[in-house]
């Protein structure tokens, strides 16, 4: 990952992360509209998802992140065997779906901030296959889970990488988008 300044003081980039990521230089951490604006701007410029971590580092027991997720970046369903995960949307529309072991959608939520009769937060239990992606150009959400983060055993994907499974995932994603944009 190349070095990218967030545009605000108090943040150190994690150059080893897959997405643009920054950790706080010191605690306590404040989250402002200006910070979220900077995060969205960096995501748009780089064409990557971007996050600021509210915790000190990957070894922290509680992991909280403000994530700007792009709608052109959606990952296939996965589960975290030992950790729950909470999504609380701050901007845009974030779709969260859970799946059974066969890859069938069990339930879907369209998370939106300050919306009438809509859900803005959902917690996915440990061991449940799920996916999350932006329905709007970007969706900014607070994600909370337990640490420490371990990229080797943190997640299990529902399907192995293959062209057939990629086609299956794309069809499911397209169906989720169509059903939730119409009903929104």
Give each language-model segment a name.
Residues 76-78, 96-98, 122-124, 130-135, ...:
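Short beta-strand His + acidic residue motifs that chelate non-heme Fe in jelly-roll/DSBH
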Residues 71, 82-102:
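Glycine- and acidic-residue-biased ligand/ion/polar-headgroup-sensing regions
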Residues 66-83, 126:
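Conserved short histidine dyad/triad with adjacent acidic residue
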Residues 1-61, 107-114, 168-184:
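A short, N-terminal "cap"/entry segment at the start of jelly-roll beta-barrel domains
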Residues 66, 86, 131-132:
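Short, surface-exposed charged micro-motifs
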Residues 59-60, 82, 137:
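Short strand-connecting beta-turns/loops that link adjacent beta-strands
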Residues 104-116, 129-184:
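Double-stranded beta-helix
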């Amino acid at each position: 990952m190349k070095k990218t300044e967030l545009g605000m003081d108090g943040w150190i980039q994690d150059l080893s992360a897959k997405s643009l990521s920054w950790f706080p230089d010191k605690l306590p951490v404040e989250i402002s509209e200006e910070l979220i604006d900077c995060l969205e701007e960096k995501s748009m410029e780089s064409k990557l998802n971007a996050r600021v971590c509210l915790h000190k580092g990957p070894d922290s027991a509680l992991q909280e992140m403000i994530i700007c997720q792009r709608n052109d970046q959606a990952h296939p369903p996965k589960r975290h065997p030992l950790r729950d995960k909470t999504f609380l949307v701050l901007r845009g529309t974030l779709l969260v779906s859970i799946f059974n072991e066969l890859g069938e959608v069990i339930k879907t939520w369209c998370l939106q901030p300050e919306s009438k009769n809509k859900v803005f937060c959902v917690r996915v239990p440990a061991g449940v296959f799920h996916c999350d992606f932006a329905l709007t150009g970007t969706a900014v959400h607070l994600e909370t889970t337990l640490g420490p983060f371990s990229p080797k055993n943190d997640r299990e994907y529902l399907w192995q990488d293959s062209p057939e499974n990629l086609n299956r995932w794309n069809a499911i994603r397209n169906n989720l988008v169509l059903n939730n944009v119409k009903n929104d």
